[in-house]
Amino acid sequence: MKRAWVLGATGATGTALVEQLLGNDEYSEVHVFVRRPLQLQHAKLHVHVVDMERAEDWQTGPAADVAFSCLGTTLRAAGSKAAQYRVDVDYQLQFAEMARRSGVGTFVLLSAAGANAKSSLFYMRLKGEAEEGVRALGFERTLFFRPGILDRGVKARVNERISMAILRVLNRIGLFKRQAPIAVEALARQMIRGEARLRDAGEYVLAERAILDL
């Protein structure tokens, strides 16, 4: 039986991930780190309310085998590039550092297609920097998931709905098949499946088609 940590449990992908972990017989404990208490209750669920800005909240955590980080925001929601960087990079890395100090062997990071720390595009660059920060911590096993457009269902943002509509039309005529939208529920399922199937120590980088092929 495995024990999991989750950061970003209230986002679209994180919510789906937590629900699936709770229903997975391979997991005995699911620890979520959130800013506010959750309404969800389950025998396996352990909720840790933390202050992202309090270093003492991020020293060590309960014993676990794998940590999943699904945290992320948008520039619009954050209000500035500095604030978005704080969420997408700094908060995720302090979570990863706590996991490493606590003896967690596997770290699974939800990144994005095109993540590159040297990119001229801010969003791609911060995703790449988050990956590099996690990589430098030297987990026994690291999985980077780089999906393209996420289908959040009713939670989808306007620009995401437009992008998905265009991409689906292109997919139907045989174009950009590797960049088809992926539902957050399917992504969460593949993150759990990837952690279970890719057992050898090392680093795994999974882009759109590789995610679906797990």
What would you call each of these model-derived segments?
Residues 2-24:
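N-terminal Rossmann NAD(P)H-binding glycine-rich loop of SDR-like oxidoreductase domains
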Residues 7, 33, 70-71, 107-113, ...:
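SDR active-site strand-loop-helix element
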Residues 31-39:
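Short, polar loop motifs at secondary-structure junctions
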